[in-house]
Regions:
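Amphipathic, hydrophobic secondary-structure cores in small proteins
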Residues: 44-45, 49, 66
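Residues immediately within or flanking Cys/His clusters that coordinate Zn2+
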Residues: 7-10, 45
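Short, flexible, mixed-charge glycine/proline-rich loop motifs
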Residues: 1-6, 37-41
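Cys/His-coordinated zinc-binding microdomains
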Residues: 14, 49-52
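Catalytic cores of RNA-modifying enzymes
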Residues: 11-12, 85
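Short recognition patches in nucleic-acid-associated and regulatory proteins
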Residues: 18-35
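Short functional micro-motifs and their immediate structural scaffolds
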Residues: 18, 53, 58
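C-terminal structural segments of small proteins and small subunits
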Residues: 60-88
Length: 88
């Protein structure tokens, strides 16, 4: 019997993918950060590892909805710089 693979939704494109194919972004109450190991505490959101989903997330401020709060512009800018190392 095959092991269950968790499915998560990308906040950029809305597609559903296996959890290990997506990048987790965490909000700990004060800042957003990339959680490449899926071990950090805080509310998480998932994003495809491609430039289009990243750009859509930033342009439409999708993290505000995912984290149910207002994310500051400097957090989006910081995330944009960090994400460039992970996107294809």
């Amino acid at each position: 019997m095959a092991a269950h693979t968790p499915i998560r939704e990308c906040i950029g494109c809305g597609g559903k993918f296996p959890k290990n194919e997506l990048l987790r972004i965490v909000y700990d109450g004060s800042e957003t950060m990339i959680d490449a190991d899926s071990k950090k505490e805080g509310r998480g959101a998932y994003l495809c590892k491609n430039k289009e989903c990243l750009d859509m997330c930033i342009k439409r401020k999708k993290l505000n909805r995912a984290f149910k709060c207002s994310i500051r512009e400097e957090n989006y800018n910081k995330l944009n710089e960090e994400m460039r190392h992970f996107v294809e």
